[in-house]
A protein has these predicted regions:
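Binuclear metal-ion centers of metallo-dependent hydrolases, dominated by the metallo-beta-lactamase
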Residues: 25-37, 41, 115, 119, ...
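Divalent metal-coordination and catalytic microenvironments
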Residues: 45, 83, 99, 126, ...
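Short, polar loop motifs at secondary-structure junctions
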Residues: 13-20, 33-35
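Short loop/helix-cap segments at secondary-structure boundaries that form the rim of catalytic
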Residues: 3, 19-25, 39-40, 91-94
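Core dinuclear metal-dependent hydrolase active-site scaffold
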Residues: 32-94, 161-167
Length: 167
């Protein structure tokens, strides 16, 4: 017998996402805005702003529309950047155990800016993700080299997010 996760799953999303959902799902989602924190089942979810800084990219992600997230449980803090650039809110994060940081042009940030941001908040581990852009894959080996060369204690973990990629 299968458990019905649909009826018990807690879903949080920014209002822009909720507005795009079909009514049956829309009514099940709790809105969460930038800088808000929600708690459920021993978890704490904090919405971190995500947005573009470069003038040519501001059309993709405006400040206040979307979220990255810090999820915390039992003293473990995990950050998901969402589609963002090297913004002050990311640089100012503290005590992050695992970070998932994007880098794909033109929608998010360059490899160099992603590395600079990670170096600023120095998570224990960082996973480059969401790095396939319009012109192929971002150079995650370069990202790893830049972070490894910094004087911080951050382990870069490379996962095969695109196993069927032809590149």
């Amino acid at each position: 017998m299968f458990y019905n996760y649909y009826s018990t799953t807690t879903i949080f999303a920014p209002q822009a996402v909720i507005d795009a959902l079909k009514t049956d799902l829309k009514n099940r989602v709790t809105p969460i805005a930038n800088d808000e924190t929600k708690s459920w089942d021993g978890y704490e979810l904090t919405a971190i702003p995500m947005y573009n800084l470069r003038e040519e990219a501001k059309q993709f992600h405006t400040k206040g529309r979307g979220n990255g997230y810090v999820i915390e449980k039992d003293d473990m803090r995990v950050y998901f950047s969402g589609d963002t650039e090297d913004i002050p809110e990311m640089r100012n994060l503290k005590d992050i155990d695992k970070a998932f940081v994007c880098m794909n042009l033109p929608y998010t940030m360059t490899v160099e800016r992603a590395a600079d941001g990670v170096i600023a908040f120095a998570p224990k581990q960082v996973y480059p993700y969401h790095f396939r852009g319009q012109d192929g894959l971002s150079d995650t080996d370069k990202f790893k080299s830049l972070v490894d060369a910094a004087d911080i204690d951050t382990e870069v973990i490379m996962l095969d997010w695109y196993p069927n990629n032809a590149e």
